[in-house]
Amino acid sequence: MRVLLQRVKQASVEIDGNVNGEIGQGLLLLVGFTENDGDKEIEYLARKVLNARIFSDADDKMNLSLQQVSGSILSISQFTLYAQTRKGNRPSFTRAQNPDIASKNYDKFNEKLRESGVQVETGIFGADMQVSLVNDGPVTIMYDTDEE
């Protein structure tokens, strides 16, 4: 499982010209699953995201978590995080999890985040989405359960 985290001042997702989710200060998460991902990976990365100390404290040091700054999450499903690009010029996505399973895992991941009390907005799994954001920092971090 991979989560590309971006610290944002604001972010939104549109589907068919309609805003489906939007947040102010918080985290934009691009979330992808590979074949054997399940509950263990979901628990691990939800905990890592929620506890990441990447917001500035009074001394301008990255020392505060999302919950400590009352931030929100915009979570976007992103199977292209598992693109294979070594051969040829067109990426292959064969390492991405089957969409039926990945959709359920995406829902479980978002629910696990919500259990902490954090506001979680989402796109729609498999939809064509337009994501807008104001990156804060920028701070961009890749989490990968294969690199625990």
Swiss-Prot record:
tRNA-binding found in the keyword field: yes
Primary site of residence: cytoplasm
Pfam family, one: Tyr_Deacylase
Gene Ontology CC: cytoplasm
SUPFAM superfamilies for the chain: DTD-like
Domain of life from the UniProt record: Bacteria
Chain ranges for the short sequence motif Gly-cisPro motif, important for rejection of L-amino acids as given in the UniProt record: 137-138
Keywords from the UniProt entry: Cytoplasm, Hydrolase, RNA-binding, tRNA-binding
InterPro entries for the chain: Daa-tRNA_deacyls_DTD (IPR003732), DTD-like_sf (IPR023509)
Gene Ontology process terms (BP): D-amino acid catabolic process
Reaction equation(s) it catalyzes: glycyl-tRNA(Ala) + H2O = tRNA(Ala) + glycine + H(+); a D-aminoacyl-tRNA + H2O = a tRNA + a D-alpha-amino acid + H(+)
UniProt EC number: 3.1.1.96
Compartment(s): Cytoplasm
GO terms for MF: D-tyrosyl-tRNA(Tyr) deacylase activity; Gly-tRNA(Ala) deacylase activity; Ser(Gly)-tRNA(Ala) hydrolase activity; tRNA binding
Domain notes: A Gly-cisPro motif from one monomer fits into the active site of the other monomer to allow specific chiral rejection of L-amino acids.
Summary of the function given for this chain in its UniProt record: An aminoacyl-tRNA editing enzyme that deacylates mischarged D-aminoacyl-tRNAs. Also deacylates mischarged glycyl-tRNA(Ala), protecting cells against glycine mischarging by AlaRS. Acts via tRNA-based rather than protein-based catalysis; rejects L-amino acids rather than detecting D-amino acids in the active site. By recycling D-aminoacyl-tRNA to D-amino acids and free tRNA molecules, this enzyme counteracts the toxicity associated with the formation of D-aminoacyl-tRNA entities in vivo and helps enforce protein L-homochirality.
Assembly description: Homodimer.
Record family assignment: Belongs to the DTD family.
Name recorded for this polypeptide: D-aminoacyl-tRNA deacylase
Gene behind this protein: dtd
